[in-house]
Amino acid sequence: MSITAERKQALIKDFGAKDGDTGSPEVQVAILTERITNLTGHFKSHHKDNHSRRGLLKLVSQRRSLLDYLKKKDEGRYKSLIERLGIRR
């Protein structure tokens, strides 16, 4: 369910401004999106797992907050990020 260290490093490299950039909103949103995608697949076969569903809702809320922050700071970066990630927002 969790993402591997290699996948996380690939996301950091793809979405970060420089190598090792883990704090930028783009990287954080990309990692959260990956985790949300994995959990969504988990619920296809474990539909009664309400404990993990609460965790999913927290992740979605955290991603929404980061996207709102990014939209407020720089709308161009926000639009390019949701296009790259395929988030319909």
Swiss-Prot record:
SMART domains in the cross-refs: Ribosomal_S15
Biological process per Gene Ontology, one example term: translation
Pfam families, sorted: Ribosomal_S15
PANTHER family cross-referenced by the UniProt entry: RIBOSOMAL PROTEIN S15, BACTERIAL AND ORGANELLAR (PTHR23321), SMALL RIBOSOMAL SUBUNIT PROTEIN US15M (PTHR23321:SF26)
Similarity field: Belongs to the universal ribosomal protein uS15 family.
NCBIfam families for this protein: S15_bact
Subunit structure: Part of the 30S ribosomal subunit. Forms a bridge to the 50S subunit in the 70S ribosome, contacting the 23S rRNA.
Its biological purpose: One of the primary rRNA binding proteins, it binds directly to 16S rRNA where it helps nucleate assembly of the platform of the 30S subunit by binding and bridging several RNA helices of the 16S rRNA. Forms an intersubunit bridge (bridge B4) with the 23S rRNA of the 50S subunit in the ribosome.
Record protein name field: Small ribosomal subunit protein uS15
